[in-house]
Amino acid sequence: MDTHCPYCALQCGMTLTPTAGPLPVTVAPRDFPTNRGGLCQKGWTSATVLRAADRLTTPLLRAADGELRPATWDDALDAVAAGIERVQAEHGRDAVAVFGGGGLTNEKAYALGKFARTVLRTANIDYNGRFCMASAAAGANRAFGADRGLPFPLADLAGADAVLLLGSNLAETMPPSVQHLAGVRSRGGLVVVDPRRSATAALTGEPGDAVGQRVPDAGRSPRRPVPAPGAGPVGDQGVHLQPVPGTDLVVLLALLHVVVAEGLADAAYLAERTTGVEDVRRPVAAWWPERAETVCGVPAERLRHVARLLAAASPVHGGAGAYVLTGRGVEQSSQGTATVTAAINLALALGLPGRAGSGYGAVTGQGNGQGGREHGQKADQLPGYRKIDDPAARAHVAAVWGVDPATIPGPGKPAVELLRSLGARGTGTTFADDGRPRALLVHGSNVVVSAPDADRVTANLRALDLLVVCDLVPSETALLADVVLPVTQWAEEEGTMTSLEGRVIRRRRAVDAPGEVRSELWILAELARRLGSPVAFPTDPAVVFDELARASAGGVADYSGLSHGRLDADEAAGGPGLHWPVPAADHPGAPRLFLDRFATPDGRARLVPVDHVGPSDDVRPDAPLYLVTGRVLQHYQSGAQTRRVPELDRVVPEPFVELHPVLGLRLGVGDGDRARLTTRRGTIEAVARWTDAVRPDTVFMPFHWSGEGSVNRVTTDAADPVSGMPEFKVCAVDVRRAPALQEVPG
């Protein structure tokens, strides 16, 4: 059975073969455009999750003694329906909220948004994609009028002379994608911007800028790092820029300054295909490389070198092409949208977007991070990437759903605000008085581990009148629930996903789900029936997709020319899948967007002026170091799946904190010691690992674990004012050696 990996947005092709062994299927890679026969460790071991030792196989209800106990589906769903009716009767429709996930199929994401807006009629629905792609989406929509992570096939990168990769560690998070960088590396054109010398940064063949930087004294006033003298080395395969955390925007402003000041911009392209260039000149003029160096720590000559390298690769200067790509490292910031906008401004100045062989793109992370934000589980959207406050969009979708447009709620709270507002803590007696949702339905998300300021989120979840979680395993969030509903996962279900390239692909069922596991489509249909909704909720994924296609017709993300049958036929004929928009059954799809015009009313891309503000929680005397969070190769997102795979868990079984050896000596934190990290949100502990891959003013922790080493317990929930994305990637921290047990008084 040909299908796709359950993890990241590469959606690597794989073949599943049923087996009588301990696992229900064997996994083999297949030749697909994104992975070309490769799989990472997570993909190779993905069958193990199908038979996780603690796989949920029956509904669970919280009993009077406080324990979760097995229940029948009727009892569990009756409890959910009764709880919803009670909360809405007492506190209003918006007192019930829904939280979705970027791993849900397109069909599930669509049905979840439809359920929230037609059955619950609540405005309060959002999803964990707000933690992943919101800033990139906001920037792309503002500039291009459309948001498709990569508006070109990933394979196009191979022909470029330069790729600027900001805040993405592809070599660990998406290993099969690295093969697409082989060509640009051979030409010395890979530029990686990352405060760490990550596995991806190491592909450039150079150490970065961190050598020689000043190490802050614990308890003293912080100082900006001093860059290494001179331009520093340039690797044989590219350049690694290692800025101060939270200053990626300064790097981009300086690069654009050089492009403008040295006459390297594509003037004809700017005149013919863009607007706003004059508005951008003023803020960019203030960021000459020497000034930028004092803030971002990257030597001025290296900034000039990279700007000239990108310009030389651009078509206007006779190059084979260049790409500017952003990832979570620069987007998960209180100025994430501004940083993405600066990256787009740079790409537009060089004449890259809308040209074959060049462009701007965002590296989508979650498996259906693209499709998951297109069809209705986002707080401000309707299917087809329509705006929920657009009267024409509301009328179109309402006709498909068979409801009055006036009954569709307006925009709801974005994820951080929604999670911050949960629980019966207000002083008023109605939802209108205190504004706090009292019930939450969670699908495909583990917010206890993945949300910022997670201790506060956990406390808010505990304060709910009703928490319902649909999950595969007893995740940390599921363990807090009043009702837990076991659901199907990737190899047990039919559906579609949309990859980081906007390629719509089929997910196929290879095995039956164990026990009493059900699909979310069935669960939503049963709840709609119990709640007395006249709106139809089909349970056949192919039928749901056909409805999604009708609802998306005419939207930015138009799937109306697609069906399960067409996707199956395309694959059977050796096709690679179809990229949206696909507005008709005979439309070939659009692998490359914007070649003729951008999706704005006048067809021109917008350059938007932005400027650097800095992190919301910057270093200070009592927290003189930067804390940066990220991922490791062996784990995925909150770790709820990968921590249950022995082959992966054995390699990285616990959280750790990386720090520079010089910093470790200064702080008295040895390699292998337990380190204590304290921010304004709280304190955590983890094993210290010395490495010169991090800056001496920075510590790094992956976020895949719960408990005392769960780094999101101490990250800030400050959010980007445009996108609502939280600032996971930088906050101020104090680091000390944790006292050994025998050292604790008493």
Question: What is the predicted function of each stretch?
Answer:
Residues V163, V234-Q237, W287-R291, L325-V330, ...:
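Flexible glycine/proline-enriched surface loops and loop-helix/loop-strand junctions
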Residues E67, H257, E262-A300, P383-A399, ...:
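N-terminal leader/propeptide and maturation segments of large enzyme subunits in energy/redox metabolism
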Residues M1-E262, P299, D404, H443, ...:
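N-terminal export/assembly segments and adjacent metallocofactor-ligating motifs
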Residues A76-V96, P153-D161, V184, P283, ...:
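Glycine-rich phosphate/diphosphate-binding loops that line cofactor/substrate pockets in enzymes
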Residues Y110-G230, L249-L253, I344-L479, T488-T496, ...:
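Extended redox/cofactor-interaction regions of prokaryotic respiratory oxidoreductases
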Residues P514-E516, E520-A572, S638, R643-E658, ...:
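Long, contiguous, secondary-structure-rich segments that constitute the structural scaffold
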Residues G92-A95, A265-L270, H317-Y323, G354-V363, ...:
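Flexible, glycine/charged-enriched surface loops at secondary-structure junctions
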